[in-house]
Amino acid sequence: MSLNGFYLLPHPPIVVPEVGRGEEKKIENTTKSFEAIAKDIAGKAPNTIIIVTPHGTMFQDYIALAYEDEISGSFKDFRAPNVSMELKINKELTSKIYELAYGERIPSVMATNDILKKYNTSVFLDHGCMVPLYFINKYYKEYKIVHITYAALSDIELYRFGMNVTKAVEELNENAVFIASGDLSHRLREDGPYGYNPAGEKFDKELLNNLKDGNVEGVFSIDKDTVYNAGECGRRSVAVLLGTLEGKKFKGEILSYEGTFGVGYGVMKLEAFSNDTSKLKELERIRKDEYESKKQEKDPYVKLARESLTQYLTTGEAIEEIPDYVTEEMRDLKRGVFVSLKKFGDLRGCIGTIFPVTDNIAEEIIRNAIEAGLNDPRFYEVGKDELVDIDFSVDVLDEPESATREELDPKKYGVIVTHGRKKGLLLPNLEGVNTVEEQLEIALEKADIDSHEDYTIEKFMVTRHKES
């Protein structure tokens, strides 16, 4: 047998009546859709439900497969500790998925309590799983679970992992269904928990329509800025889901979509109806084209940063002769420079200088690009094979000037706090830093300065260069 059910489900705890306490009535269509999906799954009577979630114990660089005899959880973090569940894990299928993924060098880990206790946690059922299962359990309980927490891997790696889920199910002749747990944009309303961004509605519409049409390439071609600004948590679950459908034509049915609370809740059922050509090679082509486009970047600042780290990772030597495309300004001016690396929207390294330590901006970029990739103490060293998925940005700092708290603006100015020899800097216009208080708190923490100590404040502006 093979997978015989494919679903995209949200996970708002508020839809559970014991949590919502009446508020769940505001997303009544989501409730009805959960009920319909639960009945559909009960009709299939699977012996295993495979679910991928954003909210289990997550490793940045390894997909985590829960591997204990049982897994349990409750809604205690959502005011409903009496609503709990305990499920048996299908260890044979979990082990087979891991074995196949490991054989293809897809970063994965069998997450046991012994391993997780090193990180002060354990195997547990998170709300990303429990919300869908709450409704399923009303109609059907004769199943084991495979619990997967995705990681910040490339679309290709997540897709290939999904392919191995299907392969494992087929090799073991399991009767199983697959659930991709994920909310869509978290930025649909000003009064929502994460505010409003027009990219939210755009992302949700594009993702759902592409899934409805069975357009795999369309899903993976959604503009990265749109994905990032939407603030979603479901796209990586969808990448695994699409991998389980590799080689199949499919269509999707949107049972409901609501954004009442500022977060997109999309409920979908996908149905494979015939064989299709492989989409994997096309996705690999898209990824290669994106990388080639990055290497042809026209902005000389980020172009130099990428070439600097690339050459060092390739040859072990830094760029010595400044390339011809470098501008006169970059050759003649001395400025502090920060080089930032992001992988799939998450920070992967950032090192910079408040004041210049080299002869010009170009040399500062060459130096700090290597430092950001290899010597940011928050991260392990960047590998050469990661460069295809990393986006570079370069901030050139203006001269800092003394400032008062009232003169700060986290969107316009960066900030430097100083107490004795302790100094902390935070760049301007950073995601998640919206107030002066937040900006100062982070800068003080970076400098290990207590907020009650006397410290000086400086502000500065930057010219930010990003890959197009």
Swiss-Prot record:
Signal peptide: none annotated. Residues 296-468 form the AMMECR1 domain. PROSITE patterns: AMMECR1 (PS51112). Residues 1-289 are annotated as: Unknown. Gene3D superfamilies: Hypothetical protein ph0010, domain 1 (3.30.700.20), LigB-like (3.40.830.10). One of its GO terms (molecular function) is ferrous iron binding. CDD domains: ED_3B_N_AMMECR1. InterPro entries: AMMECR1, AMMECR1_dom_sf, AMMECR1_domain, AMMECR1_N, AmmeMemoSam_A, Uncharacterised_MJ0810, Xdiol_dOase_suB. NCBIfam families: AmmeMemoSam_A (TIGR04335), AmmeMemoSam_B (TIGR04336). This is Protein CA_C1420.
